[in-house]
Amino acid sequence: MSALPPSSSSPAVLALHSATHKDTILHKFDTLRRSELLCDITLIVEDVHFKAHKALLAASSEYFSALFTAEEQVSQSLYKLDGMTANTFSSVLEFMYSAVVLVDESSSEQLMEMARFLVIPDLIKAHEDLQAVDEHMQVKRKRGRPKKNQDLSQKENPESELQAQTSSEIQEVNEEPASPATDGSDGEFNPREERRREGKRKIKQPIRLKGFRMDDLMEGKEPGKRGRRRKYPDTEARCEECGKVFKSHLFLKIHQRTHTGEKPFRCSVCGKEFTQKHTLLVHQRMHTGEKPYICTVCSKALSTKHSLLEHMNLHTENKLFTCEECGKSFSQQRQLKSHNRVHTGKGLPECAECHHKFMDAAQLKKHLRTHTGEKPFTCEICGKCFTAKSTLQTHIRIHRGEKPYVCKVCDKTFSDPSARRRHEVSHTGKKTFSCSICKVSFARKDNLKAHIKTHNKENPPAQAESTDKPPQSAPEQQEQEQQQQQQTSGDKELHSILQLQPFQLPAHGEQEIQLLVTGENLSLDQEQSISIITSEDTEQSLALLTQPSGHVQNLAVVTPDGNAQIQTISVLGGEVNGGDPEQMHVITLSKEAMEQLQVHHGAPQQLQVIHQLSEEQTGPVAGIHISGQSGQAISISQTTEQIPSDQIQGQTFQIQAGTVSYLYTTSMNPQN
């Protein structure tokens, strides 16, 4: 370390300079890379993963610098580089981290092609310096002296050999190299031995570079064909057709294909033609199913980087695509294209079965499966099938317990973004969806649809006859409503029924259907209770889950013969009590569904708590009780047969996908 002499001015200013600092920093980066510490990017070449640091890659290569700076606010940590060999890329990475690399004579041409493609000026300059020294050594060689290496001038390509090194030190490839350790590094470090050990572990044998050369990539030449790079005249690369100016004549040649219609790259599977080779490679991923770009948030795989960047906007909620007509913004470009049809008047894709229109063809294709019954996506865990892949991915998150989507208001987590959006509406307090029959308002559209089904089940004959009979007068409608009210007051035991459909019933002794009831989703009058009505031989398959929420700690369970013998599991104080649990289906009654009940049962009040424990029960377990106070009991009916309409005297609710949350399917440990 040296210090420059101070100037005559006062106060004195010292300029401290270290000749070894840059080498020490570079060696430290190399040590961190080999230990896989602080690495923020993984590069995949021929299925070999290379850990690295973005900052050093961007500082060494203009290609990586442009790639990373184009990410804007999206930070991707996994990239796959096509058209390269793992062995050659390992040599390039070694030069970036140590400024020294040892390569075989046969692979130097591949190394220089990759250096030009990645735009690594120091590596290219090191090769040029080595060439100049070799030419000088050939001129000064004495006559009759035996040659140690092949004359470089006899090679077809003078860029056939590279010994990467610092600008101040040059070594010949064929001589035995000394230890390349820099200042501050371990003297026993040998890059050749390190690369050989790494190659035995995970890097494939070097093969000829195919489909990578720049002139191959741009001009459609046969890959692997050696020769000098084409020299274009030193003139401006301007298109004579449209006047556009390009950085090089290579890009100009590609652009001219848009005018000539030339498409030299053809897909061997479907025959589709393309103007550029990389576009063909992206297209071929549709046939192979390859999706190398992985979302770091939800692990969704995509085939192109552009698709990944658009997908990441869904997580960041950045709406970068704005309609020029109305100013509406969208997070994906395809959404904007679909929206533009509203202004252009272009027809939307329409279903031939139900004539429903969709924003794009992809949504229509997904919808058609609802008519054909096709469910091509199967869960490998439980075997359940789905019509859409996105639905399967959400379902798999349920198995894994993953909930990456967080509500910004209450921090509640969800497994899919649509559930979070529906939940966030509840914080606004707005109920924009109203029933046209009874004027009840809902915050969510799916709850309104479920509510409308209850009206359709109440009076289906009236709807069928409405098409044949003329509309009734006002007195006739009032008389019919009075008759319906008299019928609803006839049977109080089945005043309200929440019916579990037969396809949701488990097999005897194999699974349980659990109803999770908390103070957040249930509130009744003081003289009301909850009755669970089951069919024969199904009481052992039904279980109740309650949580300590102040006033919901006891539930009434009723069987058809009046015996309270249903297995009840109560969750109080974090403990689970009951028999050996099997695989369970937990169903949560939504708050909106309870609001529908409250419309017919009055304002919500505190539920009366009744404790009745047997002598054999110990611990904080809620007792099983048959309530005698249920003037208007809310009944949850579990049957294997459809209940006749004459026995349903009140509001009927169907527990289906739209009205309940199908939360989790797992094995429950009684000790947790």
Swiss-Prot record:
Any one Pfam family match given in the protein's UniProt record, by short name: zf-C2H2
Composition skew (Polar residues), residue ranges: 160-171
Keyword entries, A-Z: DNA-binding, Metal-binding, Nucleus, Repeat, Transcription, Transcription regulation, Zinc, Zinc-finger
Presence of keyword Ribonucleoprotein: no
Family indicated by similarity: Belongs to the krueppel C2H2-type zinc-finger protein family.
Biased composition regions of type Basic and acidic residues, renumbered to the chain: 148-158
Any GO BP: regulation of cytokine production
Family matches, as PROSITE patterns: BTB (PS50097), ZINC_FINGER_C2H2_1 (PS00028), ZINC_FINGER_C2H2_2 (PS50157)
Compartments (UniProt record): Nucleus
Ranges of Low complexity composition bias in the record: 476-487
Residue spans binding DNA: 140-152, 223-235
Any single Gene Ontology cellular-component annotation: nucleoplasm
Gene: zbtb24
Major subcellular site: nucleus
InterPro entries according to UniProt: BTB/POZ_dom, SKP1/BTB/POZ_sf, Znf_C2H2_sf, Znf_C2H2_type, ZnFinger_BTB_dom_contain
Sequence ranges assigned to domain BTB in this UniProt record: 39-105
MF annotations from Gene Ontology: DNA-binding transcription factor activity; DNA-binding transcription repressor activity, RNA polymerase II-specific; RNA polymerase II cis-regulatory region sequence-specific DNA binding; zinc ion binding
Name of protein: Zinc finger and BTB domain-containing protein 24
Zinc finger (C2H2-type): 237-259, 265-287, 293-315, 321-343, 349-371, 377-399, 405-427, 433-455
Function summary: May be involved in BMP2-induced transcription.
Biased composition (Basic residues): 198-208
Region (Disordered): 136-208, 453-492
